[in-house]
Amino acid sequence: MEGLSSCATNYRISSGRWKKVGTISRYFYDSWAILEYLNTGRLAGYFRSTRGLTTWLQVMEVFYALLRDGRSESEARDLVVALQPHLIDFSFDDVLGAMILRIRMARKRRNLSYVDAIGYYTARKRGLQFLTRDPGFRGLPGVVVP
């Protein structure tokens, strides 16, 4: 797809649109954080003052949730298309690492979904803070739960 790359470009959300800024990626946006921002405007500081990245799996969850919660297909599409410059990819080895992490977390009674495991693993591997409103992540290293 045109416009997608794994390199960090500089954009931010403002009034539903991404605008160019001069900051470096610092956060990994979990689908909870993206939805919280899109639906309530909370977490705006994380989306305006810094750069964040996410994967297409989180975008998939966001798109589904927007449709489920009553947004029109075109409105939901416009919102997730705006995330394209923020997409990063993950490798086969990342998938394996994320599933090992998922098993370890399950043994500690923390049940992560496949998408959450990939997101958290990717954030940790890239040195990004994992921004989420999901209470299941509280207390884990590298997690910001505002």
Residue positions per predicted region:
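Short, well-structured N-terminal submotif of metal-dependent ribonuclease cores
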Residues: 1-55, 65-78
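Alpha-helix N-cap/helix-start capping motif
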Residues: 32, 56, 92, 134-135
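A generic hydrophobic-segment detector
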Residues: 125-146
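Active-site regions of enzymes building and remodeling cell-envelope glycoconjugates
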Residues: 50-54, 85-86, 140-146
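A generic structural signal for short hydrophobic patches within well-formed alpha-helices
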Residues: 34-35, 59, 137-138
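Active-site neighborhoods of divalent-metal-dependent phosphate/nucleic-acid chemistry enzymes
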Residues: 4, 11, 15-18, 88-129
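Active-site-proximal, substrate-binding regions of enzyme catalytic domains
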Residues: 57-93, 99
